Amino acid sequence: MVFVRRPWPALTTVLLALLVCLGALVDAYPIKPEAPREDASPEELNRYYASLRHYLNLVTRQRYGKRDGPDTLLSKTFFPDGEDRPVRSRSEGPDLW
């Protein structure tokens, strides 16, 4: 008897793992603060504006430093040692004979 393996259990497992990963990403994003009522007290407004400022600072965080372009990414991938090390020829290395 020939046993035919169906791919649906593996596909279901992969989809469930993907949903778990996406759920973790959604939970990591900060929640926008709720706006206070129209007749809110000044303390509530101050808390709202402080939490809104904190939210905007998190969402629009400045990125400092040089961004890597595609050429830099390729050079880091193929040459992980960097350009700090001088290139030596084989004649300068130890004799292997």
Curated annotation (Swiss-Prot):
GO terms for cellular component: extracellular region; extracellular space. Residues 65-97 are annotated as: Disordered. One of its GO terms (molecular function) is neuropeptide Y receptor binding. Residues 68-97 form a propeptide. Its main location: secreted. Disulfide bonds: none annotated. It is found in: Secreted. Residues 82-97 have a biased composition (Basic and acidic residues). The modification Tyrosine amide is found at Y64. The record marks P30, I31 as: Cleavage. Pfam families: Hormone_3. Keywords: Amidation, Cleavage on pair of basic residues, Hormone, Phosphoprotein, Secreted, Signal. Residues 1-28 form the signal peptide. This is Peptide YY. It comes from Homo sapiens (Human).
